[in-house]
Amino acid sequence: MSNITKMEMKKSGNNGLSCLVNIGNTCYINSSLQCLLHTKQLNTFFDTHFKKYNSNTNEFVLTKEYNDLRKLLWSKNCTISPNRFINIIQKVASAKNRDEFSHHNQCCASDFTQFLIECMHSSIQREVNININGQVNNDQDIIALKCFESQKRFYQKEYSELITIFSAIQVTSIIDIYNTKEKPSYVCEPFMSVILPIPHNVRRNGGNQITLIDCFKEYTKDETVTLGSKEKRKKIMFWSLPDVLIITLSRFHNDANRKITTHIDCKLEDIDLSEFVIGYNKEHYIYNIYATSEHNGNQQGGHYTANVKINNKWYNINDNVISQINKTNVINSKTYVIFLEKKGVAI
C-alpha cells in the first residue's frame, strides 16, 4: 500500500479523499466521520433539504458545523484539523450528560456514531401527522399494526428525515413454551443500529469460517426466558431494515482486556438479509457495504481507522493518512462497525 499524496489526489479527480487530523484521542471521531461523510443518502439530505432548517439549539449548531465540515471535505481533497467541530461536540456532550465525549478521552466509535446521528435528528425533529390505514386480515397484518403504532408513538412528535435513512423496526415475540394455544405477544421498537454477537462455534461443511449471516442468526435465534413462573420462548426479528444499516460487531467482553478478534467472512456486495425480515416486501433487503470502522487494540485503548469506497476503489483513512487498499482487505479481524446501503434506493 502506498500513501496518496496531495498531488496524486489532485490529479485523480476523486473528491472525498480528505483527511482529519487527530487532535488528541479523536481517532474514533475521525473514523466515524469518514463513514458518515461517505453515506450518500445523508449527503443528499444535507445538499437538498438542510437549508430550510434553522435553530439556535446546541444540537443544531453541531449539525450545522458537521455540514460545514462535510462541504469543505467534499469541495477539495485536503487535510483539516477539526478543532471547532470537536469543541462543539464536547459542549453538546456535556449538556447532555454524555461525559465520555466531553473530554479528550478515547471512546467507542460505534457509540459516537449513534450519538452524532441522534443529535442531528434532534436538531431538526418536528411534529408530523402519521396515519395508519388498511385492514387487519392475517397474523402478519397484526404485527404490522403493532409496528406502525410503535413507529407513530415514537416519531409523530419527533420526526426527521434521518428517520427515513437510518431507522427501521425490530420485533420481539414472546410465547409460552408449553401452552401451544397461547398466542404470541409482540414488542415492536424502532432502532437505528444493530449490535451483532459473534458466535463461538459454527459447524458447517467446508470449514468453520464465521460469516455475517451467522452473526445475524445468532442475534435472532430462539431464547428461553422465565417470566414469572412460566418458561417463555423469546425471539428477535426485524419487521424492516433501514436504507442505511449500521452494524456493530460485539467484539468486547465485560472483561476490558478481552477482545474477540475473529475474522468475520462477509462479501462486500449483494448481501441478502431478507431471511431475517418478517414484514412486507421482504425480498427487497439486499445490501452493499460502503464503509467500515476498524479498531486495533483492546477496550482500554487502541486506535480507530476507516475504510471507505470511493468511485469503486477502497481506501483506508488513518486520521491524516490515506492508503488505497485491495477490496479483499476491507473486512478483517479489526472490523468493528459496518455501514451498508440498501440496493435500489434512490439517492
Regions of interest found by a model, annotated:
Residues M1-I347:
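UBL (ubiquitin/ubiquitin-like) substrate-recognition surfaces
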